Design a protein with these regions (language model features):
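Intrinsically disordered, low-complexity terminal regulatory regions
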Residues: 1-86, 93-165
Length: 165
């Protein structure tokens, strides 16, 4: 395992994202956004999410970039949306806690979860969230992450052969 690798990360491309993030830190706790070039990790791009931390009366998380594979799984474009407006996060606001922890504590978050959408499609994924700074080294202004989906994504009532997996 490379120096600094997190043993909790199972997905190969999440490990690749983490290794790249570590390489961009320099001597800082986390990299600046300007040091982080998503095109340098092309295998991760379809699975990537880049989220702006917007602080005001409350802290909100706006998706600045959502990878094509992530959008295809969730069946909508994530870019431009606020995480707290997603139906599942309205019903289960605790799902935003990892984003708050990353933005306030500057630590990484590795998790595995099962997602059930409004159409009762169920899928499991591993998620990695990593802090980025825009202006200084102590304040998290952006979160970069990626989702690694387990196969198959289950759609009730659709035969396995018709799922295209």
């Amino acid at each position: 395992m490379p120096d600094g690798a997190d043993p909790r990360i199972e997905s190969p491309f999440l490990r690749e994202l983490h290794a790249y993030w570590l390489s961009r830190r320099g001597g800082r706790a986390f990299p600046r956004r300007s040091d982080f070039e998503p095109l340098s990790i092309p295998a991760v791009l379809p699975h990537l999410i880049l989220i702006a931390v917007e602080r005001g009366a409350t802290t909100r998380f706006r998706v600045r970039l959502s990878g094509t594979f992530v959008d295809s799984v969730f069946r909508r474009t994530g870019t431009g949306r606020y995480l707290d407006e997603a139906p599942i996060n309205i019903r289960h606001p605790w799902r935003l806690e990892p984003y708050h922890a990353v933005s306030t504590e500057g630590r990484i978050d590795v998790s595995r979860t099962r997602y059930v959408d409004d159409e009762d499609r169920r899928f499991d994924y591993e998620r990695l969230l990593l802090p980025l700074a825009v202006d200084d080294d102590r304040r998290v202004d952006m979160i970069v992450g990626a989702l690694s989906f387990a196969e198959p994504i289950v759609t009730p009532g659709v035969p396995f052969s018709a799922r295209g997996t």
